Swiss-Prot record:
Catalyzed reaction equations: a 1,2-diacyl-3-O-(beta-D-galactosyl)-sn-glycerol + UDP-alpha-D-galactose = a 1,2-diacyl-3-O-[alpha-D-galactosyl-(1->6)-beta-D-galactosyl]-sn-glycerol + UDP + H(+)
Gene name of this polypeptide: DGD2
GO biological process: cellular response to phosphate starvation; glycolipid biosynthetic process
Record-level Gene Ontology MF annotations: digalactosyldiacylglycerol synthase activity; UDP-galactosyltransferase activity; UDP-glycosyltransferase activity
Protein name: Digalactosyldiacylglycerol synthase 2, chloroplastic
Source organism of this protein record: Arabidopsis thaliana
Regulation: Stimulated by anionic phospholipids.
Record note on what altering W19F does: Reduces catalytic activity 100-fold
Annotated consequence of substituting W48F: Reduces catalytic activity 100-fold
Tissue expression profile of the protein: Expressed in leaves, flowers and roots, but not in stems and siliques.
Length: 473
């Protein structure tokens, strides 16, 4: 550890504000709440993109000329959503946006963002994503303890592509390989994710406090016998077919007669928006399609029912937000929604007729009033408590002496399993060190080392890999 009293937790993630995706928002809140009690030092490590790549990713033409400018933007965004002083650091690693994958991939050895002498505990948000093409020091060697948090059901997305089942077969083993090499502990947000050896399923995410505040205002209206919800049903999500729109429009099309009086509003932006609008227009039902908005926008406060048939999410953020706002949620009876079943306003269905019954029943009654404990379960305070418990952070902090790679893992270092793991890690190191093999497996060309522009923006030396990058210990 950096000192005997304080853990240093470095949280690495695959996206950053202003991109309002789950891996940008949730690790940001995690960093804030982990650092809030002052018992540990926390550093959030996020990708830096060159101007060209920023324009491909960030909404509303938002761009940054320097990492410090983006850091200021990120901090301001978070300060508007929490009520306490932010006590964590922000650092950047070089990244590039992969258009075909619609995601940011690391460039070079991103573990270099944390100096060796500061390396203690690493949290890899989307560990498979961060390590597919990792070429540098082994994460378990550099850090005393590495925790992976699995956010995304990559196999489900890949299965929807051409030759999807074949791709998913190989991706499953690639994910298991890299996560096993680089993580001591794996937390899966729900059982909808790929299974990993020695992993634990726990939802360690909470909701933006703004949604709980909205829910409290609605609760007060209910207590005063006022009408808190004056609108009907809606759905909000990135407008791509795989994000629940395909399932929702199929259900609406098949059951138009039973749902003849239903009016649904859809909100979102995305690559499939025109196709989705066209499909909605063909229905006899009234289905309105609008551009995406922040879910906390006052526009959404008065909707009573949130329809979410998506089964590709691991734990759907918008479902949690809708419940926090006091709404009724109608969602599929799917393992990704298991966490939400504890709330009385969560209504699940197994088939089309079940969807019709649940939707009509939800529209015809008032939502149950959430208890204080139920609201707490949705909060980031509760999510942080769950994370600390399942990741064993308190057990680590109570150790009689500092963690060390040698003392904690000495018994396994001489085992056959450890030797095989080291050999496996070395094979991955070799394979990820050649441009041809990297690109063959889907890496962005030229991502082995940061280019001149990334180096200039981040103050790195061009074509001078650090010792960590040159050597896989």
């Amino acid at each position: 550890m950096t000192n005997q009293q304080e853990q240093h937790i470095a949280i690495f993630t695959t996206a950053s504000i202003p991109w309002l995706t789950g891996t940008a928002v949730n690790p940001l809140f995690r960093a804030a709440y982990l650092a809030n009690d002052g018992e540990r030092r926390v550093t959030l490590v996020i990708p830096w993109l060159t101007l060209k790549h920023q324009k491909l990713v960030y909404p509303n033409s938002i761009t940054f000329s320097s990492p410090s400018e983006q850091e200021a933007y990120v901090r301001q965004w978070l300060e508007e959503r929490v009520s306490f002083r932010l006590a964590f650091e922000i650092r950047f690693y070089p990244g590039k946006f992969a258009i075909d994958k619609r995601s940011i991939l690391p460039v070079g050895d991103i573990s270099d963002a944390i100096p060796d002498e500061e390396a203690d505990i690493a949290v890899l948000e989307e560990p498979e994503h961060l390590t597919w093409f990792h070429h540098g020091q082994k994460w378990k060697t550099k850090f005393n303890y590495v925790i992976g948090i699995v956010h995304t059901n990559y196999l489900e997305y890949v299965k929807r592509e051409k030759q999807g089942r074949v791709k998913a077969f190989f991706l499953k083993y690639l994910n298991s390989w890299v996560v096993g090499i680089y993580c001591h502990k794996v937390i899966r947000l729900s059982a909808a994710t790929q299974e990993y050896p020695k992993s634990i399923v726990c939802n360690v995410h909470g909701v933006n406090p703004k949604f709980l505040e909205i829910g409290l205002r609605k609760l007060e209206q209910q207590k005063l016998q006022e009408q808190p919800f004056t609108k009907g049903a809606y759905y909000i999500g990135k407008m791509v077919w795989s994000k629940g729109y395909k399932e929702l429009l199929k259900l609406l099309e098949k059951h138009q007669k039973e749902l003849a009086e239903l009016e649904v509003d859809l909100y979102g932006d995305g690559e499939d928006s025109e196709e989705i609008k066209e499909a909605a227009r063909k229905l006899d039902l009234t289905v309105n399609v609008y551009p995406g908005r922040d879910h906390a926008d006052s526009l959404f406060h008065n909707y009573k029912v949130f329809l979410n048939p998506s089964t590709t999410d691991v734990v759907c953020t918008t479902t949690a937000e809708a419940l926090a706002m006091g709404k009724i949620v109608v969602c599929a009876n799917h393992i990704s929604n298991k966490f939400f079943k504890q709330f009385p306003n969560c209504r699940t269905y197994d088939d089309g007729q079940g969807f019709v019954r649940a939707t009509l029943k939800a529209l015809g009654e008032q939502p149950s009033q959430l208890t204080e404990q139920q609201r707490h379960e949705l909060s980031w305070e509760a999510a942080t408590q769950r994370f600390i418990k399942v990741s064993d952070l308190n057990r680590l902090s109570r150790a009689d002496s500092n963690l060390s790679k040698r003392s904690v893992f000495a018994s396994s270092s001489i085992s056959v399993g450890k030797n095989l793991e080291d050999m496996s890690a070395y094979i991955h190191f070799l394979a990820s060190g050649f441009e041809a093999s990297r690109t063959a497996f889907g890496a962005i060309p030229g991502s082995l080392q940061p280019d001149e522009e990334l180096c200039r923006d981040l103050g790195l030396s061009l074509n001078t890999p650090s010792p960590n990058t040159r050597k896989q210990d």
